[in-house]
Regions:
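Acidic Gly/Asp/Thr-rich repetitive segments characteristic of extracellular carbohydrate-active
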Residues: 35-71, 75, 80-81, 472, ...
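Predominantly extracellular beta-rich ligand-binding scaffolds that present long acidic/polar faces
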Residues: 78, 83, 89, 318-324, ...
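Extracellular and organelle-lumenal recognition/adhesion modules and their flexible linkers in secreted
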Residues: 510-655
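Extracellular beta-strand/beta-solenoid scaffold signature
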Residues: 81, 107-115, 135-148, 170-195, ...
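Surface-exposed loop/turn segments connecting beta-strands in extracellular beta-rich domains
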Residues: 78-79, 127, 131-133, 137, ...
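Surface beta-loop-beta hairpin patches that serve as ligand-binding interfaces in beta-rich domains
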Residues: 464, 469-511, 578, 650, ...
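Right-handed parallel beta-helix/beta-spiral solenoid domain characteristic of secreted/periplasmic
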Residues: 67-69, 75, 85-137, 164-172, ...
Length: 655
């Protein structure tokens, strides 16, 4: 739950540069700056007559259409603050030229490395920016300010590398950031229109916020403000394609906006140094925000600490197509204090893998929240509460959960759902462990949803393990949702009339070519095999590739639960060897609806073993294994394949 302190003004920066500026020609021109070969007495209009210093650039009032290009490989210390504004048809562009590394700017402890004040129609591109002088203070990498400027337009910040901004970690609206676009209080109601923050890398070592857009024109009852109403949101804000990592506090935070879009961003590591309430990607005091196609992970706190957050002062925020994982605080928070507003939020078609503390947190008297068609997974040993509802000046008033898949191999308790005044829970799947407080659901499924390979996600575009296998009971058994967004996480159509699937996947059931995941052990890790006693993966004695499964002595085993179709015949093929011919090792299958099957291998070189089995009428899983029943010898296994019969030919070599 985040409350921004809106106090203070930036120290008057005008004094830093004096009061004398030079105006260049009215005709658009390109100016070159070379830190090693330039001279401020040059004209600056050719690479052979480049300027040299920031002092020269900062003394010029540039005209619409001008370009200021800094030589790659060059470096400058201090603040870059060129003057002037462009027009809608002719913005002023800061960029680079030449070859080599991006031009490097070090603010050296000033409040900004690159700064614009009451300026519009600017584009800042392809720079490397730091702000570090060995001591922390309130500072930013790129800082754009509107103070009594009315509506300022077209601020584009594109393709920059901002890192090592050694700001303090105080959480307030005027605090430190990698990239900050800010509207300050004044006598003229002011905002920004057409802001694009695109393709930047922010981090590592940025304190405290990665990307922040905020305003002192924030006051309205929705944000629990009882003062003079002055909310004046920025419009046409797009924050996309940015990579934010190792930030002291929050990752990406659009505040006081209307219709902002936050998409295709990655936040890797937030709240690394702050110790305050923070989240990965969240919006505040903003209407009609869309947050989609993002990934947030490695959040380092349970003070909030979710990958994503619909914070208070909001209406109609949509959170969709995002991937959250390994965040200490959880996946998703929807929150408001008692007299504020958070209404009509939608959370849909997202995937959460091993998020901590609270997968979902509902805090305060939020209203009309819809959470549907999400897939949530917890692996063994996790203790997160699947849903956690608590008071913040009142308990949640109304929330609905539909068509979600909770695949819980372990979990904490479901907390506080009896406090939600109007709580609807329908057509959800809860599979695995069933802990205290689990909500009633007249159309609940507790059957295995048959995810292709849960727990295998490695990135936003690498989560196919959360699709549904053919025969899944989650296929076509969801609830129709009006205005459902029209597509799932992978872009499959979601009909307005046909029943949807449960979970984030709405495509047809998947028939994998080999249900045995990591059958060749080439991930270098045991998962999703489960070892018992002395089982491990080693980079020696592999039949093919680099890695093999090893059992040292007996009894010991490695097992894997695979997804299968009912009433279907399969063959399991694998290769094994033992270091002592008198001590067999078994390749086998069990728990498939029939009698356990195995073949014994006693050879001291890799020998192929095959077993055939037919699943039961209701069986959707089977357990394959490599088992050494006794002895002291070491056994190895590799290249396990499960296929529908007819089995692979004898001369086939599995990949």
């Amino acid at each position: 739950m985040k409350t921004m302190v809106r106090t203070g003004y930036l120290t008057a920066l005008l004094l830093l540069f004096g009061a004398v500026y030079f105006t260049v020609s009215a005709a658009a021109a390109t100016y070159y700056v070379d830190s090693s070969g330039g001279n401020d007495n040059n004209a600056g209009t050719a690479t052979s007559s480049a300027w040299k210093t920031l002092t020269k650039v900062n003394s010029v009032t540039f005209q619409p259409g001008d370009q200021i290009k800094f030589k790659k490989g060059g470096s400058w210390t201090g603040m870059l603050w060129p003057k002037g504004s462009g027009t809608s048809s002719s913005p002023i562009v800061i960029d680079s030229y030449g070859t080599g590394n991006a031009p490097l700017f070090n603010g050296n402890g000033q409040e900004a490395t690159v700064y614009l004040y009451n300026q519009q129609y600017w584009e800042i591109k392809n720079l490397e920016i730091i702000n570090d002088n060995g001591a922390s203070s309130k500072r930013s990498g790129i800082y754009v300010v509107n103070e009594n400027g009315g509506t300022l337009n077209h601020i584009y910040i594109i393709g920059n590398n901002v890192h090592d901004v050694y700001g303090n970690n105080v959480k307030d609206a005027n605090g430190s950031s990698g990239i900050k676009v800010r509207t300050k209080a004044g006598t003229v109601q002011s905002n920004y229109n057409d802001v694009r923050i695109d393709g930047n890398t922010v981090g590592p070592r940025v304190d405290r916020t990665g990307i922040d857009l905020n305003s002192d024109f924030w006051c309205r009852p929705d944000a629990e403000c009882t003062g003079t109403y002055n909310w004046y949101p920025s419009t046409n804000v797009v924050i996309q394609n940015n990579y934010v990592n190792d930030v002291g506090g929050d990752g990406i935070v659009p505040q006081n906006t209307s219709g902002a879009i936050v998409q295709y961003n990655t936040v890797n590591g937030f709240n690394i140094r702050s110790g305050m309430v923070n989240a990965g990607i969240w919006s505040y005091n903003a209407d009609d925000t869309i947050i989609q196609y993002n990934e947030a992970f490695n959040g380092n706190t349970t003070l909030d600490g979710q990958g994503f957050d619909i914070d208070y002062g909001q209406s109609r925020t949509i959170m969709q197509y995002n991937y959250s994982h390994d965040n200490d605080g959880g996946f998703m928070m929807v929150t408001q204090p008692g007299t504020a507003k958070n209404d009509g939020g939608i959370v849909r078609y997202n995937i959460s893998q091993n998020d901590g503390a609270r997968i979902f947190q509902l805090a305060g008297p939020i209203t009309n929240v819809q959470i549907y068609n999400n897939t949530l997974y917890l692996s063994p040993g996790q203790t997160a509460s699947p849903i956690y509802a608590n008071s913040w000046g009142g308990y949640p008033k109304s929330a609905a959960f539909y068509n979600n898949v909770f695949h819980l191999e372990s979990a904490g308790t479901w907390y506080g759902l009896n406090t939600v005044a109007n709580f609807t829970f329908n057509n959800n799947t809860i599979y695995g462990v069933h802990t205290a407080g689990e909500p009633a659901d007249s159309n609940k499924s507790t059957a295995n949803p048959m995810l292709v390979n849960p727990g295998s996600g490695t990135g936003r575009l690498a989560v196919d393990g959360y699709k549904l296998l053919a025969g899944s009971p989650a296929l076509g058994t969801g609830k129709l949702i009006a205005s459902n967004g029209g597509k799932d996480y992978w872009g499959n159509a979601v009909s307005a009339t046909a029943l949807p699937n449960r979970g984030a996947y709405n495509g047809a059931g998947i028939t994998p070519s080999n249900p045995a995941v990591n059958g060749g052990l080439e991930s270098g890790a045991l998962s999703p095999w489960y070892g018992w006693n002395a089982a491990s993966v080693v980079n020696s004695n592999a039949r093919t590739g680099t890695y093999a499964l090893r059992l040292v002595g007996g009894p010991s085993s490695a097992e894997q639960v695979i997804q299968v179709e009912p009433n279907t015949t399969y063959s399991l093929t694998g290769y094994a060897m033992t270091t002592n011919a008198g001590e067999p090792v078994h390749i086998g299958v069990k728990n498939f609806g029939g009698t356990q099957q195995f073949t014994s291998i006693t050879g001291t070189s890799y020998t192929k073993g095959t077993v055939t089995f037919t699943t039961g009428a209701a069986n959707t899983t089977a357990t394959i294994y490599l088992y050494k029943p006794s002895g002291t010898a070491t056994a190895y296994g590799d290249d396990f394949v499960v296929a529908k019969s007819p089995a692979m030919s004898a001369d086939s070599s599995p990949e």
